[in-house]
Amino acid sequence: MDSQGLKTLINYYCQERYYHHVLLVASEGMKKYSSDPVFRFYHAYGTLMEGKAQEALREFEAIKNKQDVSLCSLMALMYVHKMSPNPDREAILELDTKMKEQRKEAGRKALYHAGLFLWHIGRHDKAREYIDRMSKMPHDSNEGPILKAWLDITRGKEPYAKKALRYFEEGLQDGNDIFALLGKVLCLEIRQNYSGALETVSQIIVNFPSFLPAFEKKMKLQLALQDWDQTVETAQRLLLQDNHNVEALRMLALYYLCREGDVEKAATKLENLGNALDVMEPQNAQLFYKITLAFSRTCGRNQLILQKVQSFLEKAFSLTPQQAEIATELGYQMILQGKVKEAWKWYRTAMTLNESNISAVTGLIRCQLIEGQLQDADQQLEFFSEFQQSMGKSAELMYLHAVLATKKNNRQDEVINLLNDVVNTHFSHLEDLPLGIQYFEKLNPDFLLEVVTEYLNLCPIQPAGPGQPLSPVLRRCSSVLETIIRSVPGLPQAVFLMAKVKYLSGDTEAAYNNLQHCLEHSPSYAEAHLLMAQVYLSQDKVKLCSQSLELCLSYNFNVREYPLYHLIKAQSQKKMGEVAEAIKTLHMAMNLPGMRRSRASSKSKHRTEVDASHRLSIFLELVEVHRLNGEQHEAAKVLQDAIHEFSGTCEELRVTIANADLALAQGDTDRALSMLRNVTTEQPYFIEAKEKMADIYLKHRKEKMLYITCYREIAERMPSPRSFLLLGDAYMNIQEPEEAIVAYEQALNQNPKDGTLARKIGKALVKTHNYSKAITYYEAALKSGQQNCLCYDLAELLLRLKLYEKAEKVLQHSLAHEPVSELSALMVDGRSQVLLAKVYSKMERPSDAIAALQQARELQARILKRVQMEQPDAVPSQKHFAAEICAEIAKHSAAQRDYEKAITFYREALVHCETDSKIMLELAQLYLAQEDLDASLRHCALLLQRDQDNEPATMLMADLMFRKQDYEQAVYHLQQLLDRKPDNFMTLSRLIDLLRRCGKLEDVPRFFLMAEKHNSRTKLEPGFQYCKGLHFWYTGEPNDALRHFNKARKDSDWGQNALYNMIEICLNPDNETIGGEVFENLNGDLGTSPEKQESVQLAVRTAEKLLKELKPQTVQGRLQLRIMENCCLMATKQKSSVEQALNTFTEIAASEKDHIPALLGMATAYMILKQTPKARNQLKRIAKMPWNPIEAEDLEKSWLLLADIYIQSAKYDMAEELLKRCLCHNRSCCKAYEYMGYIMEKEQAYTDAAFNYEMAWKHSNQTNPAVGYKLAFNYLKAKRYVDAIDVCHQVLEAHPTYPKIRKDILDKARASLRP
């Protein structure tokens, strides 16, 4: 590294207070550049700051006559003398005189180094004077402006930072000045432009790869951007270059402690850090001290970490025993370790060193509170309160006030207000601080956990019931804990307390997830096992509850002394019906030390107060089990004991409420209400008592007016945002949203920044169907700066109202912001992107929808990466959301026929949520569409294994069995569903289709009978009529089919399909091959007769009328409608109409890849227009496509038409292959049998021809006379005269005038029978 690089390194280490580093770099500079006195000066300065004043004096004396450093050396000599306990006044006077003389004659360099030295010792204003003088001299260097910028920036204020950035930019115009680049980084950091700062650091690393502070900066900036992975990578890279790098070791230790929660690895890194400090900064007491702060506050009072930290502090104190702040910190360490006597000693030592040390006094008050010296603590706190305004608010002193108020049994609301002030004051010091070492120190999770514990002591110990509003105290706890877990996800105590908050909030699922996460990292956490037992108990999982209690006891035998342990055990025994055992367990709990005030020793006083709510719960549970055991007298006796025991305490009203609950359980609502009415506004449980009364009025007496009166009384007597919120929620409970809006607005007036209230008002307006007002309200709320979550609600409403463009604008506005790192903000963005995709889908912009979903997927990947550490309770829901996003992308891909992509995303969805039956079903269906039967069967079987009653999966399994030609199994699966529910018409319609494809339509009628027997009104059901129509259509009875479909056509569920089927029947009642030529002239002149022509035209007009009734809601539905409209045009057989249809089909085929109905339409049009080669090309294209159930009918028609073309060309083998394919997928396909018969007849294989015509005659239900004619003719040729005569009679019975059959076949068959 060159001279300038080394000097920048020295400046950096001076500012960071790494004085041994200064010494080492200066030594290196002296070796490389022995003629440069600057390095000798900083060697002396480093020596001085390490406490070796005499050695430093000698070094400064040796260089005080060197021109460039003479002025700063004289200043340094004065500084040394002034630092001395007994300063030499004469020497100082003499040096001052010399310095003034030197200053008059000093050149640019001398002034620059003097300014630099003054900056390093914190004399900013004096330094500026020297730099200003220097700037007035002629120069061609940027040194002065760059140092001036550094002076501005180290003031740490935004306006100065702006000006400093300008100076640094000017300083960089002539090249990459490393000192200016470092300054620019700091400027951007102060302005919170961490990405920009990181870019600049990268610039330093590229140009100066051996400049290690750049890597340290990079590491800290990556942490500020909350990218722990990159931070760790940079730290490890640093250690490869310098294995004693203090910052890298500190960062890795913090990573293992805060992020991973791996205490052993963190302790190892701390050990390495201590060794590195001994080598690199052995005399730096301040560094030893400052390094401990973040660790002691984030380790969750882990003894291993605290012992390491203590050794650092003891080293620091041994180096500077006069430092009161280090003694104070040692006192705090003793508190954290539970060594109160040791803490007293260190706090008193600190007071001796500095009588005005506020932190030491605060520590002493804390000791007094722990020891129960309430009067002394009260006096001290009173004294501090008098001058707290002048010294600024202290969160810790407020907290001690709150603790004292709790111990003195002050009103709950007073304690809550104090704790609220503590939190607000504490978090005000964190504003604008990025994630980093200072943030961890200021956040002080340990302190916040103490505050949360105090909050929780004020909460009801019973979880909130369903629909019960969340307690503001619990909401506050949740907010504080979210902040801790977001920053220090490796802290098990925070995760445990979050689980407790979730449990008390009634969210047992979230509590369970948090506890699982907590116990994975800390399996011996006894209290977590205890809470897990409570969670299991609330979920009625009694065996698991018992297992958790056993685990708890195995990890900590002392839990037998916890009343809570016995309480949970008794409750689980009660649930198992072991009431007598529960009574024994509770009596054991009643005999525990501290359970009764009269028995409580001073030693157990603190713990008794903390567990007061659990003590009361033991009493109340004992009342309950005695009552259940029929021991009413004993129950009443225990309740009286509870009244006596808790009289005058903050728990007294819980006894009253429990007494009311007991009366209520006995059906005495009057007595319950009488007790609750006695609770006054001044008492702590007033709101809870009123809520209980309201509940009685609503649920037991069904008196809505008295119910709402209770909440009105709360709002009148205690007018607060919470009271009006409760009133609003109460109005919503009784379906009075207009009144609810008024109450919510009153709450919002008192708390205008509460986004939750704004959302409630919006939702209430939507509930009143006042949509326009709701939109106006949301828009106004957003303009006034309400939370961005309102954007989502507004967009959702606009989507619901089909105002797609407005919804798109709202969502785009909500997403148009700088990149965010807050987890909650990322979640909002993810949800907004998914909603935007829904909007795009409705606007028929599938590519934009997929793009939005891809954005959501990327966001969700980031969320999942962080949520496991920061919000473990949210992991299942976030994984489910990630699966939904992937499934949506898969659906869009499948719609665009990109099946491979669809399968990839469905698989990804199952990685997130492997048990999601809906996604598994969709993937199985997709595999089926891809003809991958084994993969489809595998997923379907797995799904049915988990849920054997899953209807769609059973239907899919039936499809699969059909594809595998296992028809009996296919029918069996659908029969299973119908046996369970005979009137399941969706399944019945599918079964009819399946029996048709199996060639067993004769089995259908019995299922109609089953449905009719199941419900006498079945015949009136549109689904039943639809299924009947389907059966008649498939059995060659088009008129009956139309009649039944007509009865279903107005139904919302069945109507659209019924209409499509009716249109198809109108266009092709006899199920002919439209466009086919083989059978075109078989019926002679019947096809061209006026009656036939008129009948066709009438049918087309009917189809056109029916088309107008179709109202498709999807893109595919609208496409299907277009296809049908053009099929109507083709049915007219008029050239212009057919050509018009052909153009439309061609357009669709061009825009929709492999669209079978459009390709079939084109082929049919070409056949009608007598352009057979073009038709054949399209049909051959279709023939290469795999079969799928959705397009089965069109595929069948395509194969039949292509077979017709091949037969016309006498390519019978190719035709047979296609016809066999038709029969493979539909054994009732009359037309396929008819064509096969025709081929056999042409080949004079009359027996085979007769067999195929026989199948065609059977499956057309003997209704088609043309098929009957051909069958009789081939019987005649095969010499089966009796069969030929029977068929002739069947045809003539239905069609007496059918031409030629009598003369050509009947008479000849009879003649052949005569001897």
Curated annotation (Swiss-Prot):
Keywords: Cell projection, Cilium, Cytoplasm, Cytoskeleton, Repeat, TPR repeat. TPR repeats lie at residues 108-141, 145-178, 192-225, 285-323, 324-357, 492-525, 563-596, 616-649, 721-754, 756-788, 790-821, 830-863, 883-916, 918-950, 951-984, 1022-1055, 1196-1229, 1231-1263, 1265-1298. SMART domains: TPR. Pfam families: ARM_TT21 (PF25058), ARM_TT21_2nd (PF25060), ARM_TT21_4th (PF25068), ARM_TT21_5th (PF25064), ARM_TT21_C (PF25063), ARM_TT21_N (PF25062), TPR_8 (PF13181). PROSITE patterns: TPR, TPR_REGION. One of its GO terms (cellular component) is cytoskeleton. Component of the IFT complex A (IFT-A) complex. IFT-A complex is divided into a core subcomplex composed of IFT122:IFT140:WDR19 which is associated with TULP3 and a peripheral subcomplex composed of IFT43:WDR35:TTC21B. Interacts directy with WDR35 and TTC21B. Interacts with TTC25. This is Tetratricopeptide repeat protein 21B. It comes from Mus musculus. The gene is Ttc21b.
